[in-house]
Amino acid sequence: MKLAQDGYEVHAACANTGGFSEEQLKANEQNAYRLGAAKYVTLDVTHEYYEKSLKYMIYGNVMRNNCYPISVSSERIFQAIAIARYAREIGADAIAHGSTGAGNDQIRFDMTFLVMAPGVEIITLTRDKALSRQEEVDYLNAHGFSADFTKLKYSYNVGIWGTSICGGELLDSSKGLPEEAYLKHVTQTEEQLLRITFDKGEITAVNDEPFDDKIKAIQKIEEIGAAYGIGRDCNVGDTIIGIKGRVGFEAAAPKLIIEAHRLLEKYTLSKWQQYWKDQVANWYGMFLHESQYLEPVMPDIEAMLTSSQRNVSGTAILKLRPLGFETVGVDSVNDLLKSKLGEYGEMQHGWTAEEAKGFIKVLSTPLRVYYGIHPDEER
């Protein structure tokens, strides 16, 4: 509204990464025109987000602090890219967004716009004028825009890869989120098995129902897992600007998919494949979180992650229960546990007893040498 009053021809754009229903998108459009936009568009980048980043996050089992599936932070960059692309298409002179000066999103948006839309002015009225929510509400009311502006205790960001929750008890380090803070609640109490089938690291079936559309597969798993209240947690981490941040989230699909995928990899990858993939995946997740998706090293990491998935095919089985789940097993033609060389702790067929003793003696050589020279350092 303020920009239109200042003489700008405002083109409002909503970049959707799977977090809006049709009703919400329609309401966005109506509100945009009520606030003075000359044009409104929805830019659906959900599938682009999956193809260009989300599938690599699954390949890498990316969890920030072994906890948070970087739901919002990974989506923001694709929202920003979509907005920058649209701004170029219409020849925009400026891009405006509503970030404050207190969080990570201002960095993700501004950096992307600076790189993807060079020369285009970036307008951030909320940040520049240090506006409070109440000041924004007062301004809208004064200019005839009436709506329910009741301040929510929590703020939510919803996307295909989970929902983040901020505010309320999260501002007190000694408190956790109450049940009413979550958008989805437990409706299933009976245990059930969930089968997730992968082909080279990508989901192809859920409970033996085939899915060509990976987004629909994720949504199906979310529907199943959310009914058990699975995927709730709270992450405390370091923000890009250097302060600690605390965010609650509910992410049933990410938690179930990543743990199912990780389980399948335990059976189908070598020790060193798993080790090195974990190292580069941690870097990948950190770079996504810290607004470095456009860094030239990212495609190199993606190539390594893709290569690592060539044998990650099969079905992982999980047992779901209210507020939790456990891994059961896998069914895969690439199951390395099926080796005919031996059964762990039971019987071996690939070596003799004397060969085993020789292997152990050779393996111990470096330690025998060291402690032979430094007997006083024995532990």
Name the predicted role of every residue range.
Residues M1-R379:
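Nucleotide-activated chemistry modules centered on ATP-dependent adenylation/adenylyltransferase
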